Amino acid sequence: MKEIIESIIEGIPHGMIFDTHTIIEYLLQKDSDAYLQNCDGRTTTSYHGYIGQVINDIAEEGLVRRVGDSWSLNIHKRFSECACWQKP
């Protein structure tokens, strides 16, 4: 999953801010097989938390940096709090 998320982030223009919901939505639209294969029986909340942790791990390597939180649509089309990231 880390490699897939890194490739998504690599396609985001430098300086852009995005949130974890954006990465999840991209996975669902462009690589739904990878999204489903890596779910491992987790609940949606748990799995999306895992995806956020993967992005945080990528941030520790310097590919992105955390820039606060957003209030954005989740996969259920409901607004919820979500971590924001910026690609330097």
For each of these PLM feature ranges, what is it?
Residues 1-11, 21, 29-88:
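Phospho-regulated, low-complexity intrinsically disordered regions of nuclear gene-regulatory
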